[in-house]
Amino acid sequence: VDVNRGEIVSILGPNGAGKSTAMKAMLGLLNLKSGSVVIDGKDISKLSPQERVRAGISFVPQTKNVFSGMTVEENLEMGAYLRDDNYQNVIEEIYELFPILREKRNQLVGELSGGQRQQVALGRALMIKPSVLMLDEPTAGVSPIVMDELFDHIIKVKRTNVAILM
C-alpha cells in the first residue's frame, strides 16, 4: 500500500479479509511476515509500536477509540502523551478543525453523539502531528448524515498534508 501526504487511500474488502489486521501490522501491533513499513523514506519495520507513533503513524481503531469518562480536552491531551513540547497550540489547531469540540471541551466524551466522539478520536490521533493517519472503519455505527459530516472532516485533515489510510 502506498499513501502519499495529502492523499486518502482506502483498503476495500469483505469482512474478515484482513483490512484491520494489515493496519495493526503497519502500526507494529502484529508482526509482519513480509514487506516493510516506510514513512518519509525511512523503514520503520523494526520499530516498536511506540517508536512508530513517534515516527509519525497515528491510528484510530474502529471501536473503543475514546475515553468516555474523560472530557474532550483530556482525551486530546492523552493523544499528546509522547510529545515533549507545549502542545496547547496543537489543541487549538484541533479546535479549528473541529469547532464543536471547543464548545464541548469540558464535557465528558461519553455524553457526546457518535459523530462528536469520532471527532474526538480523530483529534486525539492528530495531536502527534502525524504524517500518516490510519482510520479503521471510521464510519462504523454512525448515521448516514453523520457519515457525510465525518468525511468532510477527513477531507479537512487531508488538506493539512496528512496521508490517510482507511
Give residue ranges: language-model regions:
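Glycine-rich phosphate-binding loops of nucleotide-dependent enzymes
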Residues: 1-166
